[in-house]
Amino acid sequence: IIDPEGYPHYERSVTSLRYGSSSRNKEAWNKRFGNDNMWLSKTQSELASIGFHGTGAFCTNTYSKIQTHNQSNPNAPMTLAPSFGFLSQFRSQNGHAYPGNTSDNELGLVLYSDWAEFCKTYIRSAMASYLNDANVLGFFSDNEINFSSQNSRILDRFLQLTDRTDVAYLEAKKFMEEKNATSVTDNLNSEFAGRLAELYYKGVKEAIKEIDPGMMYLGTRLHGTPKYLQHVVAAAGKYCDIISINYYSRWSPELTTYVKQWGEDWADAPFMVTEFYTKGVEDSDLNNQSGA
C-alpha cells in the first residue's frame, strides 16, 4: 500500500486493541501501564519492534485514544481501521424491518430506495472523527455480512419469505423470472448474492468518495461461504479499494485455487486477510481450544 506521503506501507495490524474486562486483566494493566499514555506508547513500541504498525476492526473505546496518541507522537503513530454497522443502523435509523424479521436477511435492506442517501448521512455522523485523518488506513462498513452460508443460500431464504410484498421476496422472484428458472442452483445464488453485493458496496463507495475521497474502503471482511462466491467477490472488487477477508476453516492457504482467484481472476482489487487462526505457544496457560 502507498501511504499518504508516497512511501510503501506493509499493513500488519492487531485486530483488537482494547481493555480486558477481567480482574486479572485490570490488575496486570494497572501494574504494567497505569495510564493510557503509557499503555499506548509501550504498545506501539513493542508492536513496531516485531513489524506491526496498525490496529484493526475491534478496538472498542480505544480508537479516540489511539488518535490522541498519534497526535502526541507524530513520528510513532498507529494506523486505524475502524468497523461500522451500516446495515443495522440503516434499519434502526430509517425504520425498515429485516426481511422475515431476522438479521440473517439484513442484506435485503439495500433494496430500499433510501440506502444510498443513508450511506452519506451515516458517514458524515458516525465517521466524522476519522474523516481526513491520514493515520486512518480505511474503514470496514460491516462485519461478515451473510451473503449466504454453507446450509442457507440467500436466494432460497428470500424466496421463502411469507410476506409477498417484501422487497427482498419481490427481488428474488423477479430474478428467477428473469433467469426463467424454477429452482435455485449454486450458480444462480452466487449471481443473485452478487447483485445485492453490488448495491451494497456501490452505496458505501459512492458516499465515501463524495465525502472523503482519500479514505480507503476496505469492504466487509468476507468470511465462510461469501468469500467463495465469485459474484460477491467481484462486486467487492469493483467498489472496494482493498477486499478484506477473514480466513478460517483452513489451516493452510488455498494458494492454487481460491487465493489465486481472489488475487488474479475474480476481482479488480487487491485483498488482505483481516483475521486468521492463531494459537497460544506451548508454554502458555492457554488451552488452545479457540484461536480467532
Q: Which residue ranges define each predicted feature?
A:
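Short, acidic/turn-prone active-site loops that include or flank metal/cofactor-
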Residues: 84-89, 247-250
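Short catalytic/ligand-binding loop motif for oxyanion handling, primarily in non-cytosolic enzymes
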Residues: 10, 63-67, 89-92, 145-151, ...
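Structural recognition of the beta-strand scaffold that forms the well-ordered cores
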Residues: 2-3, 9-13, 53-57, 79-83, ...
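Polysaccharide-binding and catalytic clefts of secreted carbohydrate-active enzymes
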Residues: 101-112, 129-231
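Glycoside hydrolase catalytic-domain groove-lining segments
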Residues: 182, 187, 191-287
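Active-site-adjacent substrate/metal-binding segments within catalytic domains
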Residues: 1-76, 89-138, 187-190, 194-195
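Residues that line or immediately flank small-molecule/substrate-binding pockets and catalytic motifs
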Residues: 15-16, 59-62, 139, 143-144, ...
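C-terminal structured "cap/appendage" subdomains that terminate the fold
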Residues: 290-292
